[in-house]
C-alpha cells in the first residue's frame, strides 16, 4: 500500500510539473512579426514587376517602390528580399504565408474587396485614376461615355472596382479584367488601337507616356486616392506600426518628395536634336573634349567618334549634368560603375570619358563570342544602356521566335517585348524598358554617322567656321522617332 501511495505521489508530481511546464509555455509570447524580421535579418517584400514599382536595369534593382522599401529595410538594419507576383490576386494570397513575404509594396489602393485580405499603412503617394484613350478616336468626357467601348484593366485592381461600381449605374458598360498584362501592356494596347480605353493611375501614365505617343487622358475618374503598403491581416501591429512611423518620417524629412521628383517629376524624351543644334555643339562643345575621346579611344582600341557619339547621347557633351536617377557627368556614369572603373570624380570630363570608354569595352568583351561585328558593337551599346542580363533575355526570345540571336536587326525586335508582361514573365531578368536601348543604339548610330562624315579632312574647316550642313536630319526640327536602321 505504501508503494502504491508513493507511486500516486510521483505521478501527481509529474502531472503537476507537466501542467506547469505547459502553462508556462503558453504564457511565453510568440515573437512579433517585427521581432522575427529583425531576428532573421531579412525583410521579405512582395511587389509587382513594373516601371512604377520594381524592375532591374543596367544598374541593378530599381523602381519607386523598391527604393522606398529598401530605405525601410536599411532603417531596420536588415537585408531586403524581393518577390514579384504575376497579378494582384497572387500578391494578396502570398502576403503573410509562412516563410513568405510580410509586406506588400506595390502601389496599392485600399478597397472594399481587399479589406479582409490585408491591413494598409498610412498613405505615401497621391494618385488620380485616369481614363486613357487613343488620340484621333472618339474621346469620352464622362462615365456615361464608357458604354459601348472596349475596355481592359488589371484584374483585381482598384480600377476594376471602380468599373464594377459604375456598371450598377450604367448596365451597358462592359469591361475585361486581365491578369496576363501590366500597365505598360494596357497603354500599348490603347496606343496601337487594340482596345478603346483603359484606366491607369496618374503616376504610371507620367512614367510611360513618352513611349506611347498616341495615348491621351480622356478624363479623371473620381477623386485623388492614396497608395499604401499592406501587411497581412491579424492582431499583430508591430510591423504595421513600424511602417507607419517610417512613412511619416520619410514624409517629414523630404525622402518621399525626393523620390517622387526623381521618378515622376520629369519626362525623359528620347530622340535626337536638330542639325543646327548639333552643328553648334560640334563647334562649341566637342573641341573641349575631343583630345580625351581620342586619347582613351586609342587606349581601349575603339573608334573615338563612336565614343563621342555615346557621350553626346548621354549628356550632349555637358560634363556637369546630373540626371534624376543619380547618374552624372559627360558619360553619365552611375556611382557603382564609376567606382569599378576607377573614376573618383564623375564630373571631371577626362575621368568620365576614361571610365566610359573602359566600361563600354568591358561590356563589349563580355558578349558571347558568337556575336560578330558590326552587330557586336550595336549589342554592346544596348547592353551599355539596359544591362547585359536584359540583352540576353532578348536574345533568348529571338531564339524562340526562330530569329538570329546574333543579329541586331532581329534582337532589336525582341527588346521592346521586355516591357510586355506576356513576354518578360518568361525571362530571367524580368521587366525592362526595352524600347530604350533600341532608341539609344539608333541615336548613337546617327550621331556616329554624322561625326564620321564631318571629320573628313575636307570638312573639318567647315565645322570650325560653323558653316556645317549635316545631311539626313531636318534642320532645327527634333525627330519624334529614331531613324530606321
UniProtKB/Swiss-Prot annotation:
Predominantly, its location class is membrane
Q: Name one GO cellular component term.
A: cell outer membrane
Show the disulfide pairing.
none
* Ranges for region Non-LT domain: 30-267
Where in the cell is the protein located? Cell outer membrane
Q: Which domain of life is it from?
A: Bacteria
Q: Which CDD domains match?
A: MLTF-like (cd13403), PBP2_YfhD_N (cd01009)
Checking SUPFAM superfamilies in the record gives: Lysozyme-like, Periplasmic binding protein-like II
> Which GO BP terms apply?
cell wall macromolecule catabolic process; cell wall organization; peptidoglycan catabolic process
Q: Which residues form the signal peptide?
A: 1-29
**InterPro entries the UniProt entry points to:** Lysozyme-like_dom_sf, MltF, Solute-binding_3/MltF_N, Transglyc_AS, Transglycosylase_SLT_dom_1
Catalytic residues?
Answer: 314
Q: Identify its membrane topology class.
A: Peripheral membrane protein
* Record field: catalytic activity: Exolytic cleavage of the (1->4)-beta-glycosidic linkage between N-acetylmuramic acid (MurNAc) and N-acetylglucosamine (GlcNAc) residues in peptidoglycan, from either the reducing or the non-reducing ends of the peptidoglycan chains, with concomitant formation of a 1,6-anhydrobond in the MurNAc residue
Domain comment in the entry: The N-terminal domain does not have lytic activity and probably modulates enzymatic activity. The C-terminal domain is the catalytic active domain.
For this protein, the record's HAMAP family field holds: MltF
What this protein is reported to do is described as: Murein-degrading enzyme that degrades murein glycan strands and insoluble, high-molecular weight murein sacculi, with the concomitant formation of a 1,6-anhydromuramoyl product. Lytic transglycosylases (LTs) play an integral role in the metabolism of the peptidoglycan (PG) sacculus. Their lytic action creates space within the PG sacculus to allow for its expansion as well as for the insertion of various structures such as secretion systems and flagella.
NCBIfam families, per database record: PRK10859.1
Entry's family note = In the N-terminal section; belongs to the bacterial solute-binding protein 3 family. In the C-terminal section; belongs to the transglycosylase Slt family.
Its recorded name reads Membrane-bound lytic murein transglycosylase F
Amino acid at each position: 500500500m505504501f508503494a502504491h501511495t508513493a507511486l500516486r505521489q510521483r505521478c501527481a508530481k509529474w502531472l503537476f510539473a507537466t501542467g506547469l511546464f505547459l502553462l508556462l509555455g503558453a504564457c511565453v509570447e510568440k515573437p512579433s512579426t517585427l521581432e522575427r524580421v529583425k531576428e532573421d535579418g531579412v525583410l521579405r517584400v512582395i511587389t509587382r514587376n513594373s516601371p512604377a514599382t520594381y524592375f532591374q536595369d543596367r544598374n541593378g534593382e530599381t523602381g519607386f517602390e523598391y527604393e522606398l522599401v529598401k530605405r525601410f529595410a536599411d532603417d531596420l538594419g536588415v537585408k531586403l528580399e524581393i518577390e514579384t507576383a504575376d497579378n494582384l490576386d497572387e500578391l494578396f494570397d502570398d502576403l503573410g504565408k509562412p516563410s513568405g513575404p510580410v509586406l506588400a509594396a506595390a502601389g496599392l489602393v485600399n478597397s472594399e474587396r481587399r479589406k479582409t485580405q490585408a491591413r494598409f499603412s498610412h498613405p505615401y503617394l497621391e494618385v488620380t485614376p485616369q481614363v486613357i484613350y487613343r488620340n484621333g478616336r472618339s474621346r469620352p468626357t464622362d462615365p456615361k461615355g464608357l458604354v459601348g467601348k472596349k475596355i481592359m484593366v488589371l484584374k483585381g485592381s482598384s480600377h476594376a472596382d471602380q468599373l464594377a461600381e459604375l456598371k450598377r449605374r450604367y448596365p451597358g458598360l462592359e469591361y475585361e479584367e486581365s491578369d496576363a498584362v501590366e500597365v505598360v501592356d494596357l497603354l500599348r494596347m490603347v496606343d496601337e488601337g487594340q482596345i478603346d480605353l483603359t484606366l491607369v493611375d496618374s503616376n504610371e501614365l507620367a512614367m510611360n507616356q513618352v513611349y506611347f505617343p498616341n495615348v491621351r487622358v480622356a478624363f479623371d475618374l473620381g477623386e485623388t486616392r492614396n497608395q499604401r503598403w499592406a501587411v497581412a491581416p491579424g492582431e499583430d501591429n508591430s510591423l504595421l506600426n513600424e511602417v507607419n512611423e517610417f512613412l511619416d518620417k520619410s514624409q517629414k524629412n523630404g525622402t518621399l518628395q525626393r523620390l517622387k521628383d526623381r521618378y515622376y517629376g520629369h519626362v525623359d524624351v528620347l530622340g535626337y536634336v536638330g542639325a543646327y543644334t548639333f552643328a553648334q555643339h560640334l563647334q562649341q562643345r566637342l573641341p573641349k573634349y575631343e583630345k580625351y575621346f581620342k586619347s582613351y579611344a586609342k587606349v581601349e582600341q575603339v573608334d573615338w567618334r563612336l565614343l563621342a557619339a555615346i557621350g553626346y547621347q548621354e549628356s550632349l557633351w555637358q560634363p556637369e549634368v546630373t540626371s534624376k536617377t543619380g547618374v552624372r557627368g559627360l558619360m553619365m556614369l552611375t556611382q557603382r560603375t564609376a567606382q569599378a572603373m576607377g573614376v573618383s570624380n564623375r564630373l571631371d570630363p577626362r575621368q568620365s570619358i576614361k571610365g566610359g570608354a573602359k566600361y563600354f569595352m568591358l561590356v563589349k568583351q563580355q558578349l558571347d563570342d558568337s556575336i560578330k561585328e558590326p552587330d557586336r558593337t550595336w549589342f554592346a551599346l544596348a547592353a551599355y544602356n539596359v544591362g547585359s542580363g536584359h540583352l540576353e533575355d532578348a536574345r533568348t526570345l529571338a531564339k524562340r521566335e526562330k530569329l538570329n540571336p546574333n543579329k541586331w536587326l532581329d534582337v532589336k525586335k525582341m527588346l521592346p517585348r521586355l516591357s510586355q508582361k506576356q513576354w518578360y514573365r518568361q525571362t530571367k531578368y524580368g521587366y525592362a524598358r526595352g524600347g530604350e536601348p533600341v532608341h539609344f543604339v539608333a541615336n548613337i548610330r546617327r550621331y556616329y554617322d554624322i561625326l564620321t562624315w564631318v571629320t573628313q579632312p575636307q570638312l573639318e574647316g567647315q565645322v570650325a567656321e560653323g558653316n556645317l550642313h549635316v545631311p539626313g536630319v531636318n534642320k532645327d526640327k527634333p525627330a519624334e522617332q529614331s531613324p530606321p536602321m
